[in-house]
């Protein structure tokens, strides 16, 4: 099965699509040093062309960087997320890579400022719609 290595945070797309994978979590230490030795001890031993997190290993295929990994799973241009003028277009009948990117960006903003979407009902509605959709298996 696939192996996903990442910091101890998100793995939404694989979970949502019910994809079988082995998980390798790397935990960053606490402030002020933020010890990264869990990752640094194995970083150059994984035979990755560009050793970085996240990484995805699927057989002979070894990929690093979030967007590169997501492109492998779903071939959608990520730059659409930046164009909110077309907001209603990127969430269609099925969730796509762009929807996950959008959700992630909005959710991270809410972590820093929980009320940041209060004046944007369309974005709040998008957040609610995302995970009310049925799971899209492969």
UniProtKB/Swiss-Prot annotation:
<protein>
    <recommendedName>
        <fullName>Glutathione S-transferase Mu 5</fullName>
        <ecNumber>2.5.1.18</ecNumber>
    </recommendedName>
</protein>
<feature type="domain" description="GST N-terminal">
    <location>
        <begin position="1"/>
        <end position="71"/>
    </location>
</feature>
<dbReference type="GO" id="GO:0005737">
    <property type="term" value="C:cytoplasm"/>
</dbReference>
<feature type="binding site">
    <location>
        <begin position="65"/>
        <end position="66"/>
    </location>
    <ligand>
        <name>glutathione</name>
    </ligand>
</feature>
<dbReference type="InterPro" id="IPR036249">
    <property type="entry name" value="Thioredoxin-like_sf"/>
</dbReference>
<feature type="binding site">
    <location>
        <begin position="39"/>
        <end position="43"/>
    </location>
    <ligand>
        <name>glutathione</name>
    </ligand>
</feature>
<keyword id="KW-0808">Transferase</keyword>
<comment type="function">
    <text>Conjugation of reduced glutathione to a wide number of exogenous and endogenous hydrophobic electrophiles.</text>
</comment>
<dbReference type="GO" id="GO:0006749">
    <property type="term" value="P:glutathione metabolic process"/>
</dbReference>
<dbReference type="InterPro" id="IPR004046">
    <property type="entry name" value="GST_C"/>
</dbReference>
<feature type="modified residue" description="Phosphoserine">
    <location>
        <position position="1"/>
    </location>
</feature>
<comment type="subunit">
    <text>Homodimer.</text>
</comment>
<comment type="similarity">
    <text>Belongs to the GST superfamily. Mu family.</text>
</comment>
<dbReference type="Pfam" id="PF02798">
    <property type="entry name" value="GST_N"/>
</dbReference>
<keyword id="KW-0597">Phosphoprotein</keyword>
<feature type="binding site">
    <location>
        <begin position="6"/>
        <end position="7"/>
    </location>
    <ligand>
        <name>glutathione</name>
    </ligand>
</feature>
<feature type="binding site">
    <location>
        <begin position="52"/>
        <end position="53"/>
    </location>
    <ligand>
        <name>glutathione</name>
    </ligand>
</feature>
<dbReference type="InterPro" id="IPR050213">
    <property type="entry name" value="GST_superfamily"/>
</dbReference>
<dbReference type="GO" id="GO:0004364">
    <property type="term" value="F:glutathione transferase activity"/>
</dbReference>
<dbReference type="InterPro" id="IPR036282">
    <property type="entry name" value="Glutathione-S-Trfase_C_sf"/>
</dbReference>
<dbReference type="InterPro" id="IPR003081">
    <property type="entry name" value="GST_mu"/>
</dbReference>
<feature type="domain" description="GST C-terminal">
    <location>
        <begin position="72"/>
        <end position="135"/>
    </location>
</feature>
<dbReference type="InterPro" id="IPR010987">
    <property type="entry name" value="Glutathione-S-Trfase_C-like"/>
</dbReference>
<dbReference type="InterPro" id="IPR004045">
    <property type="entry name" value="Glutathione_S-Trfase_N"/>
</dbReference>
<dbReference type="Pfam" id="PF00043">
    <property type="entry name" value="GST_C"/>
</dbReference>
<keyword id="KW-0963">Cytoplasm</keyword>
